[in-house]
Amino acid sequence: KGEAGNGIRLSASSAAAGVTATATAMTGGAADPDLTPALAAVANAGHHIITSPFARQESLLALREHLEFVSGPLEQRGAIGVFGHPGTLATGTQLAGQINSGRISGAWYPGSRALPCEIAAGYAAVLASEEDPARPLNTLEIKGLDITDPTDWSGRTEQEAALHGGLTPLEVGPGRRVQIVRAVTTYLKDPQGIDDPALLDLTTIRTLDYVRKACRDRISLRFPREKLSERTPPKVRSELLDVLVKLEELEIVEAVEANKTSLIVERDSQDVNRLNARIPTDVVNGLHVFAGRIDLLL
């Protein structure tokens, strides 16, 4: 069944006196299926979230290439990908570092009997349920996953290491519910190899995709058959500014008034039919860290 089959967990027990049972871990699986043909088949179908059944470098690199294509400047159909990881923190962060994508997020649930595909499916379902791209996913429950042994639960130190290593930690919360600690992507470094937190939170890329679509939809609705004259850029700029103001009211972006001078719409110097726009987008961040100091008064 491929390398993924090695992740199937087996256990055995016996209630008969004097009889012991031993379960041998699954081995021998190799060569997971290539995801490239499947991704190519759905490239033009339209999607927002793709779940990878395999948590392997080859599969996730193929997914990364696909997401960069459909979300790029030509297709402009923003999408994200997810995978699951029930293994160790070390192997998970190593895998995340190999992917380094702001569009791929991996859910880490150590010690789970669930397969990576099952963890990923549950995680993706929660992502799809949140319609506000800027709202954090902290504490949201992932249904259908097993409750791991307390010896496998991650502590705050491990969770922080996971977050800054490109993994989304899952934990067993009150009422024995599996919850998201904080949703992050595998993006850790820029092309120069320098640590870059710009796209670490999953909400950032989802917000940017949301803003892009909102702006494109407004221009398509207002100017379906527009002439391009000297009067056109100011009208387009006014519409874009209105979109940003409305997004600010929804707390998806902020500081629109302070940044509006950076909103530039101008005709292209080479293509007579093209209008270029520079749209400043100050995304609303999530409240993930609270720091306080207790002063003793006597």
Could you describe each region identified by the protein language model?
Residues 1-117, 259-261:
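Polar low-complexity, Ser/Thr/Gly/Ala/Asp/Asn-rich disordered segments used for subunit assembly
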Residues 29, 125, 165-166:
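Glycine-centered small-residue hotspots that permit tight backbone geometry or close packing
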Residues 87-162:
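Loop-centered beta-sheet repeat module
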Residues 134, 139-152, 158-298:
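Structured, hydrophobic secondary-structure cores that serve as assembly/anchoring elements
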